[in-house]
Amino acid sequence: MGTVSSRRSWWPLPLLLLLLLLLGPAGARAQEDEDGDYEELVLALRSEEDGLAEAPEHGTTATFHRCAKDPWRLPGTYVVVLKEETHLSQSERTARRLQAQAARRGYLTKILHVFHGLLPGFLVKMSGDLLELALKLPHVDYIEEDSSVFAQSIPWNLERITPPRYRADEYQPPDGGSLVEVYLLDTSIQSDHREIEGRVMVTDFENVPEEDGTRFHRQASKCDSHGTHLAGVVSGRDAGVAKGASMRSLRVLNCQGKGTVSGTLIGLEFIRKSQLVQPVGPLVVLLPLAGGYSRVLNAACQRLARAGVVLVTAAGNFRDDACLYSPASAPEVITVGATNAQDQPVTLGTLGTNFGRCVDLFAPGEDIIGASSDCSTCFVSQSGTSQAAAHVAGIAAMMLSAEPELTLAELRQRLIHFSAKDVINEAWFPEDQRVLTPNLVAALPPSTHGAGWQLFCRTVWSAHSGPTRMATAVARCAPDEELLSCSSFSRSGKRRGERMEAQGGKLVCRAHNAFGGEGVYAIARCCLLPQANCSIHTAPPAEAGMGTRVHCHQQGHVLTGCSSHWEVEDLGTHKPPMLRPRGQPNQCVGHREASIHASCCRAPGLECKVKEHGIPAPQEQVTVACEEGWTLTGCSALPGTSHVLGAYAVDNTCVVRSRDVSTAGSTSEEAVAAVAICCRSRHLAQASQELQ
């Protein structure tokens, strides 16, 4: 674009307005239908657009995203996310350029908010007709249509989270959470309720949509109900979990319990700015809400988590896969499902708690007694995954107050480690989700003393791959965790194995589907191993008639896991690596057609051993567990037959699954064994004993 000539005549502003309406009546009318209260009208003055001109970025394509739940969409409002290194001044220029180019085409726009501090971008109100234009602007990474989020709520709970050896009335927690501040993003709060008076500071932050319906009556007790109850569950004097924790409330949900993705984003940005201006001790953010899957909301949660903030969220009350919702699907967030007094999944009418691989653990979420906004001394019972998330936020506050230096990865591993295990009736979940859903109910630790001297591991499942022949699935550990082993699982049994590989400077677990397969899962075993030095050793397929072998040849390195994969088709028949525990325990042995991979690690005092359990006749499931004091790091099957569906770790147990033997046509020679690699750290154990 050239500069404006000094001889150019400028038209009067009223005439420009009239011309604009005549040239673009459809766009202007559509935008007025969505919001008739625009505060600013931007005209495409040629000189302004010339000043904003920037060279477009080549080789990059911005993408558009919107909520998969049509009733929750909010067309006309968009979050424009810019590339990571974009400065605030560039964000503002990009927003002005969008306004100028839109006005030139006859459309009105309004910049509602410019993000900085958490992620670069801006929130804009505009016609959907402008999306193509906006996607071509410099610095734009992606655009997401705004959508709705909802509150997830429709004294047995304190008893349930108390360690088994104690009664709730005699249990003294290691810390009441006094060093931790909990941010609550919810409705407004009745801060003078006796349960939370003096414990909750109501901030001046508010970003909520108008209530649906012109006759909606805003009763104070109704507007404060959800937030007041959850604040009481987290830190209430009588019914709270972390009675010493302080709280700050941000209002992002209206009186109907409804908010927006953009409002939640601005709330998270508010927390990040507060953290930068006035750094305090450990922070926990409670997000007792859920909306459709949102890339931008998950990205914001990731940024905040990597800044040291612990985020806890509700899994959702839709009796559905939690991975379809945000922020529940964000890997950096601790996602909580709900159980009842019998430790069974909560049913809410025709719906109920969400489930699946994106859930980290469950917690009490049915008929929870807490503060009521009806009066300053009233109590009420509420149910939902919001209440479950509030319990875990309280437990997290207590753990962080006792050990303020805990990272998110360390906190998550402790929450999983101290949970009650295998108490949920898995039959409640859909069949294809049972193996993916953790059978864990949150509990307070009996003591934080000595917890730091244990080897903690957890199992992370990937999303299901596609059914195509070359489809793969990838499972990743958190940045502070070590990937110690990799396995795969296919319900059809048709897979080409798995392997660990470097991606972005971090090891990941990749599983391979096979011809005729229905898809595959990758399963990572993610552990906390301080000062670890880990590497992968690979042996290519061997010559005919020979087995493939690989071992840990570096001094001081021990075997933590074995995996294998086929580069060529073997009709979908995966034959996993065979561990030989006798003679050379640091060795993986496999079939000659496969590449074999050994995960070898060195860490202070680390020692590992192989444990095998086989059954002479074929079984649908074979297990082997590590003894107390040892932690499962690797899990595989021996030998590999066409009937093996895969191997995976459940807590400290290695599980090998096979197809139904009654229909698989198996023979007695095809017995399957589960092989576990169990590790511990002598260095950590000795340090723990010295402290006791």
UniProtKB/Swiss-Prot annotation:
Cleavage by furin and PCSK5 generates a truncated inactive protein that is unable to induce LDLR degradation. Undergoes autocatalytic cleavage in the endoplasmic reticulum to release the propeptide from the N-terminus and the cleavage of the propeptide is strictly required for its maturation and activation. The cleaved propeptide however remains associated with the catalytic domain through non-covalent interactions, preventing potential substrates from accessing its active site. As a result, it is secreted from cells as a propeptide-containing, enzymatically inactive protein. The record marks Q152, S153, R218, Q219 as: Cleavage. The keyword Ion transport does not apply. Disulfide bonds join C223-C255, C323-C358, C457-C527, C477-C526, C486-C509, C534-C601, C552-C600, C562-C588, C608-C679, C626-C678, C635-C654. The active site is at D186, H226, S386. GO terms for molecular function: apolipoprotein binding; low-density lipoprotein particle binding; serine-type endopeptidase activity; very-low-density lipoprotein particle binding. Its proteolytic activity is autoinhibited by the non-covalent binding of the propeptide to the catalytic domain. Inhibited by EGTA. It is found in: Cytoplasm; Secreted; Endosome; Lysosome. GO terms for cellular component: cell surface; cytoplasm; early endosome; endoplasmic reticulum; extracellular space; Golgi apparatus; late endosome; lysosome. Glycans are attached at N533. Its cofactor is Ca(2+). Its EC number is 3.4.21.-. Gene3D superfamilies: Peptidase S8 propeptide/proteinase inhibitor I9, Peptidase S8/S53 domain, Proprotein convertase subtilisin/kexin type 9. Belongs to the peptidase S8 family. The C-terminal domain (CRD) is essential for the LDLR-binding and degrading activities. Monomer. Can self-associate to form dimers and higher multimers which may have increased LDLR degrading activity. The precursor protein but not the mature protein may form multimers. Interacts with APOB, VLDLR, LRP8/APOER2 and BACE1. The full-length immature form (pro-PCSK9) interacts with SCNN1A, SCNN1B and SCNN1G. The pro-PCSK9 form (via C-terminal domain) interacts with LDLR. Interacts (via the C-terminal domain) with ANXA2 (via repeat Annexin 1); the interaction inhibits the degradation of LDLR. Crucial player in the regulation of plasma cholesterol homeostasis. Binds to low-density lipid receptor family members: low density lipoprotein receptor (LDLR), very low density lipoprotein receptor (VLDLR), apolipoprotein E receptor (LRP1/APOER) and apolipoprotein receptor 2 (LRP8/APOER2), and promotes their degradation in intracellular acidic compartments. Acts via a non-proteolytic mechanism to enhance the degradation of the hepatic LDLR through a clathrin LDLRAP1/ARH-mediated pathway. This is Proprotein convertase subtilisin/kexin type 9. It comes from Pan troglodytes. The gene is PCSK9.
